[in-house]
């Protein structure tokens, strides 16, 4: 018997990967950090310029964590970018060290295998401009030495295992379909909402498990469920942060009788919603803002966050928190700071280019920046990787 493996892609919500993954022995995906930065991450030009040769610092990790949840934890990188590709709007070469970093990041997130696409750059046909580990003349391309370095390092490395993360993040394909059908704003995108939350968690130094809405919140210090179309009654038993748009529709995409959010235990109703253009964010009292989306609330629950104008921005009843808008990065961080002590989370304030991944036994640090960075007495060069025993 041989295992059945299939490869997924980045930012694709056209089918439910959990359902397909349940029929596979191993899920895999195609990781093209630089190509994805320019054609699907949604980064502005400043970020694209800064990460042009490295890729977005969270996009690969997001998909590692997502696809780890689709086949009982078994996953590969089926295609890893080794150099310039042939299909992105522009196709730069990686910063030296990045092919090694991308591979180590995948292994730190639990990958069993990292395969490069491709072995040799073909001198013919439609992909002849797609780099490989070998040039068309069969001589080594720049990434070959880095792949060999990773192989040598792996041979000496201990088995680090995959630890349960302290926080969970719900990703739900039905919600993606629903908000694609009814965005109510030109830039309301479910993937982007969840990804913004993920980025905020990673900037705080947290490892994340991405899971379907069947997650057991009692297994995590906090479970985040932004934009979740319907909120099952089972989503309780631990601290949960839901919203915006969570529980706002039925499975038939109708407004619940009595209005949303249809979340067990909450005494809060959304009376109307408004989508916000990029030039009109709504400031939060104390810092941060809602962008793209805001909901007006009637509530008998405790208000834990206000808009600058005084209206409720987030409410809480017991272990359920509902946030009535799409927070910017500062807004997400304020919410995390508010909850961290009760949840028993130790938060960091990582430099923009630095990311941390914790395994059973080790901490892995990754510098996605084009320059060296120092944090907590650790200095990583550009495209640097560092690991230490916990």
Task: Annotate the PLM regions.
Residues 119, 172, 213, 245, ...:
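Cofactor-binding loop segments of dinucleotide-utilizing enzymes, especially the Rossmann-like FAD-
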Residues 28, 217-230:
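Short, well-ordered secondary-structure micro-motifs within conserved domains or adaptor modules
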Residues 5-196, 270-286, 290-293, 305-308:
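Hydrophobic targeting/anchoring helices
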Residues 197-218:
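A short, well-structured beta->alpha microelement
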Residues 227-390:
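A conserved amphipathic helix/loop scaffold
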Residues 139-158, 200, 321-343:
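Catalytic cores of secreted or luminal carbohydrate-active enzymes
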Residues 167, 208, 223, 317, ...:
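Hydrophobic, well-ordered secondary-structure elements that form the walls
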């Amino acid at each position: 018997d041989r295992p059945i493996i299939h490869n997924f892609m980045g930012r694709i919500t056209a089918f439910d990967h959990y359902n397909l993954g349940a029929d596979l022995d191993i899920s895999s995906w195609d990781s093209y950090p630089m190509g994805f930065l320019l054609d699907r991450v949604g980064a502005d030009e400043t970020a694209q310029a800064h990460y042009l040769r490295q890729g977005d610092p969270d996009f690969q990790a997001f998909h590692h964590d997502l696809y780890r949840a689709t086949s009982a934890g078994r996953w590969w990188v089926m295609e890893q970018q080794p150099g310039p590709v042939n299909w992105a709007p522009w196709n730069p070469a990686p910063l030296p060290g990045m092919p090694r970093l991308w591979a180590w990041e995948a292994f730190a997130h639990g990958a069993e295998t990292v395969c490069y696409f491709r072995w040799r750059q073909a001198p013919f046909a439609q992909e002849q401009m797609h780099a490989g580990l070998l040039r068309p003349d069969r001589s080594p391309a720049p990434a070959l030495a880095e792949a060999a370095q990773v192989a040598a390092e792996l041979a000496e490395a201990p088995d680090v295992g995959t630890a349960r993360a302290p926080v969970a993040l719900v990703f739900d394909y039905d919600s993606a379909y629903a908000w694609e059908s009814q965005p109510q704003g030109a830039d309301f995108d479910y993937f982007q909402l969840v990804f913004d939350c993920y980025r905020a968690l990673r900037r705080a130094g947290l490892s994340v498990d991405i899971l379907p809405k069947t997650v057991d919140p009692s297994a995590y210090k906090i479970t985040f469920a932004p934009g979740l179309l319907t909120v099952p009654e089972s989503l309780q038993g631990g601290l949960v942060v839901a919203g915006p748009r969570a529980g706002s529709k039925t499975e038939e995409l109708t407004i619940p009788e009595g209005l949303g959010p249809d979340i067990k235990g909450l005494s809060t109703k959304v009376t109307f919603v408004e989508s916000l253009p990029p030039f009109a964010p709504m400031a939060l009292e104390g810092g941060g803002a809602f962008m793209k989306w805001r909901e007006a609330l009637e509530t008998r629950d405790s208000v834990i966050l206000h808009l600058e104008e005084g209206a409720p921005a987030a409410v809480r009843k017991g272990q359920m928190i509902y946030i009535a808008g799409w927070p910017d990065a500062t807004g997400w961080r304020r919410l995390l700071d508010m909850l961290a002590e009760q949840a028993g989370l130790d938060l960091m304030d990582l430099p923009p280019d630095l990311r941390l991944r914790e395994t059973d036994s080790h901490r892995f640090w990754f510098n996605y920046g084009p320059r060296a960075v120092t944090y907590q007495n650790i200095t990583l060069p550009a495209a640097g990787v560092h690991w230490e025993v916990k």
